[in-house]
């Protein structure tokens, strides 16, 4: 919640100027240092009036208790002389409470307005109603909810909660999970990618996001400078669906085999009589691992004989995508939405090549130029447009005697110019065409023109306005607005 500070002096209340004042009414004229009335008594404080107050250097304004309707105390208000709690945290501020504070000689307090705040009153109301006041009680209550039949103890509750989120052997947020979380929370995309566990800040961000979703839509800046976009997620958007390749599926099965093998080894170690002379072969049996791998390739729902009628059918079979299988959908439960063509399929999944019958829309094929990135998201290639001009980029393979480094991405014209300026006997840089690959959520940020836009010999877009798309919607954009173009 946004916290406001109230100062009490000579039985009067003074509200420290903050953004919470916007929308509230004044009980007295707000006057600047030069005597000019910024806001008249009884009028609402608008954003422009608030900006004028800041510019005039006004730090606090006089208010009445009626102006603080809907305010709640942030912390416990304690009488320092006798230790009496005048008002507990998260209780509504009343005239009676203020009178007690004045009597006790308390000079300031911190308040918040749940109904005015973007977070809403849900959090405040929940904390007020919640009878559990300590972390130990909370852990035991979580254990009761998760394991209804078992008698809860503090130790078992702590171990269960720790295992759910903070034990790397039992919980793995995964690199792709951290990537998507960072994007959603406005953090740098590759921040803490290798960290498999959640931090307290992660929990705070999730709760804050979910509570604000009721009131906030679109972009909003956070207190620490991040930009978060509040919107409902589309489950069929290819930014929220990823390809799980055979290596990842096999890794999961292999892990299960290793867990079974570990259990068998521990059992043997507990009953083995001569541990001092025991050899690894006496304790380790690799059958659970090999059985898991064989079961995966032999009887998995996704395991198929490759279509080798000809090289083309072989390639087609290898490029096939399936929404079925373990962890996926079933033909019976899959609805119309998941089978339908989505706007993000453009350039990624072929909208035509899908079987008829119960598998329609669940089995599909990659588009010609699509590729799968390291996180499993399908990417589509684009050509860059700068100030209404199409610029082809190249990737440096061998820099030769130029100043480039292998892997550099530079405009093709620039690379040709640098090679031309090399003296005799100098080795030119070799390069290959470089398209800009983007995933579905990256594509949503840009205005992308169609591949058939007319350009002149210098790559300049001829038309003043062209057909383009942005975040799945088709629009008419000026040539200078276009940032990328389809291949």
What residue ranges belong to the model's regions?
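Intrinsically disordered, low-complexity regulatory segments
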Residues: 1-487
